Amino acid sequence: MLVIGLTGGIASGKSTVARILERLGATIIDADLLAREAVLPGTPAHRAIVAAFGTEILLPDATIDRKALGRIVFANPDARRRLEAITHPAIARLSQARLAEARRSDAPAVFYVAPLLIEAGAADRVDDIWVVYADRETQLARLTERDGIGRGEAEQRLAAQMPMDEKASYGSAVIDNRGTSEETERQVVALWKERIEKNPR
């Protein structure tokens, strides 16, 4: 069973590529979904986040207000490091369990979709890395539209991540997602045929 890390910068199009891969038959494990699960009310990570950042980052139902917390951590590198020290180990535990389960399945490949795959030191959990690439202006345009934030806040979020060109250097495959959805799909299908269908494991 081949486990491939799918990573890329914020708003580069990882979810779009993951949906294409799922249609092709891949099993998808999404680190963003695991991150939400890891900080549900009652979990140790939830308690640690509230202790570190206060109850003002909670919604009325006691779940974490991701936008409020995001405004804090993207503006303050120390706060971001404090948050990551809490969340990364919790996400790692969940992802290791899901990956172990997925390795026992009969899917042709498992893709672990993780924006911080490299930064979180999780690259050793996968057999290969594919990077979804978009240039800075494309990322900014998508991020402001998707999250309803201003350009300044979008730039802060980009600045908090590894530069896209550096991240691309870690991939054995780079999917250029600056063009149309059809162009992206053609690249993904070609990679699937070349890397997965021709090399079943």
UniProtKB/Swiss-Prot annotation:
UniProt xrefs under InterPro entries: Depp_CoAkinase (IPR001977), P-loop_NTPase (IPR027417)
Gene Ontology cellular component list: cytoplasm
EC number: 2.7.1.24
Pfam family, any one: CoaE
Cellular compartment(s): Cytoplasm
Domain of life: Bacteria
Signal peptide region: none
Binding site residues for ATP: A11, S12, G13, K14, S15, T16
Keywords from the UniProt entry: ATP-binding, Coenzyme A biosynthesis, Cytoplasm, Kinase, Nucleotide-binding, Transferase
Listed GO MF terms: ATP binding; dephospho-CoA kinase activity
Pathway assignment: Cofactor biosynthesis; coenzyme A biosynthesis; CoA from (R)-pantothenate: step 5/5
Ranges where the DPCK domain occurs: 3-201
Catalysed reaction, written as an equation: 3'-dephospho-CoA + ATP = ADP + CoA + H(+)
GO biological process per UniProt: coenzyme A biosynthetic process
Known function: Catalyzes the phosphorylation of the 3'-hydroxyl group of dephosphocoenzyme A to form coenzyme A.
HAMAP family referenced in this protein's UniProt entry, alphabetically: Dephospho_CoA_kinase
Family of this protein: Belongs to the CoaE family.
Protein name: Dephospho-CoA kinase
Species name: Geobacter metallireducens (strain ATCC 53774 / DSM 7210 / GS-15)
